[in-house]
From Swiss-Prot:
Organism whose genome encodes this protein: Danio rerio (Zebrafish)
Transmembrane portions of the chain: none
Record protein name field: mRNA cap guanine-N(7) methyltransferase
Gene Ontology CC entries for this record: mRNA cap methyltransferase RNMT:RAMAC complex; nucleus
Keyword Transferase listed: yes
Keywords noted in UniProt: Methyltransferase, mRNA capping, mRNA processing, Nucleus, RNA-binding, S-adenosyl-L-methionine, Transferase
Length: 400
């Protein structure tokens, strides 16, 4: 664990201070695929013959190229083996994972505090819950009910097992929230048809590192939004994290090829210069952890689509901006140190750095050379920062 007074996270990556010409990048997206109505602020369906077919029931689903991709995603995550804490700590990207986990912890805690100002009982939908990596966050947030939904059946089974373990390890007087587990492709199936209580309403929907998969098509993106938002109470929140399309396109355009990355991650597009609003596919890999196709989320379109479900964007920050804002709060800074979300530099005598690659810690080395700076520092390697800084945080609120 890092020293209590360590200086936190000095960044010196080529992307940390780069200016993004968002107007020029936005104009690169192909708007011919869709139009928005000024009267309804909703996105009309134009693709795959969906103009007149609003029936999302399983009986209406066809086996298409899109659905085959969803099956690939489910199969991929079903094959990922569960590993213990000791094994995860050997990962090259352990500090980046911890950093992302800290960021989610801060986001979830702040939103639950807002909700609890209005309601004593809190119900949450974890949309794309995976293996249940946020279960302890919900327990710490003292919620009352959690619904977990994911496309991968094996992930849902592991999530349920984790939940049972949390309950079993808890103190007899320590009440744990009730939970419901649903296996579903949330970009194609309506959760309201699968809930034990079809009238259940949520105070929060959390969608972490998931929503971009739904931007394969307009109908999928819309169904995912519907699942996230239609059962939210007025004043409820839809929160999440997703890749920043502006940042991805900027780095791609700066690259000499159709790909970019470093020793921990890579992103590969089929070509440059054309970025359709839906189905803009790229291949993403992260230290062997994830290697499935993903899709750009053009955020202005995301915001416009959300209006259909009476949602208003109230917060949007890149991970860099979120960190710089939230670490100013002492309790968040303490949490970051407790979660070991930054790597100690220089390491102690028995430790070693996560990477021996050239230039990975030059930014920390320069900072540590300043006599006015207290050592040790807390940092991420250059490669980890470049990987995590492609993401952003968003919060939508349900209007009355």
């Amino acid at each position: 664990m890092m020293a209590q007074n360590s200086r936190l996270f000095e960044m010196d990556s080529p992307y940390a201070d780069a200016k993004v010409d968002k107007d020029s990048i936005g104009s690169s997206f192909d708007s011919s695929q869709t139009s928005t109505s000024s009267s309804s602020s909703s996105v009309k369906r134009r693709r795959d013959g969906d103009e007149e077919d609003d029936d999302h029931s399983p009986s209406k689903k066809l086996v298409t190229e899109d659905s085959l991709h969803s099956q690939k995603v489910a199969t991929h995550y079903n094959k990922i083996k569960e590993c213990g804490l000791a094994e995860r700590n050997k990962s090259r990207i352990v500090y980046m994972r911890n950093f992302n986990n800290w960021l989610k912890s801060v986001l979830i805690a702040e939103i639950l505090d807002k909700v609890r100002q209005k309601r004593r009982e809190v119900t949450v939908l974890d949309l794309g819950c995976g293996k249940g990596g946020d279960l302890l966050k919900w327990k710490k947030g003292r919620i009352d009910k959690l619904v977990c939904a994911d496309i991968a059946a094996v992930s849902i089974e592991q999530c349920q097992q984790r939940y049972n373990d949390v309950r079993r390890r808890g103190h007899p007087n320590d009440r744990t929230f009730s939970a419901e587990f649903i296996t579903a492709d949330c970009s194609r199936e309506l959760l309201s048809e699968k809930l034990q209580d079809p009238e259940l309403q949520f105070d929060v929907c959390s969608c972490q590192f998931v929503y971009h998969y739904s931007f394969e098509s307009e109908s999928q993106a819309d169904t995912m939004l519907r699942n996230a938002c239609e059962r939210l109470r007025p004043g409820g929140f839809f929160i999440g994290t997703t890749p920043d399309a502006y940042e991805l396109v900027k780095r791609l355009e700066e690259s000499d090829s159709n790909s970019f990355g470093n020793e921990v991650f890579s992103v590969t597009f089929q070509k440059k210069g054309e970025y359709p609003l839906f189905g803009c596919q790229y291949d993403f890999s992260l230290e062997g952890v994830v290697n499935v196709p993903e899709f750009l989320v053009y955020f202005p379109l995301f915001v416009e689509m959300a209006k259909k479900y009476n949602m208003r964007l109230v917060y949007k920050k890149t991970f860099k901006e979120f960190f710089e804002e939230k670490v100013k709060d002492g309790k968040n800074k303490d949490l970051m140190q407790w979660m070991q979300a930054l790597e100690q530099y220089p390491p102690d005598e028995r430790g070693q750095l996560s990477s021996s690659g050239p230039g990975e810690y030059d930014h920390a080395k320069r900072k540590a050379a300043d006599p006015a700076v207290r050592r040790p520092l807390g940092t991420l390697s250059k490669s980890e920062w470049e990987a995590t800084s492609i993401y952003l945080v968003y919060v939508f609120e349900k209007m009355s």
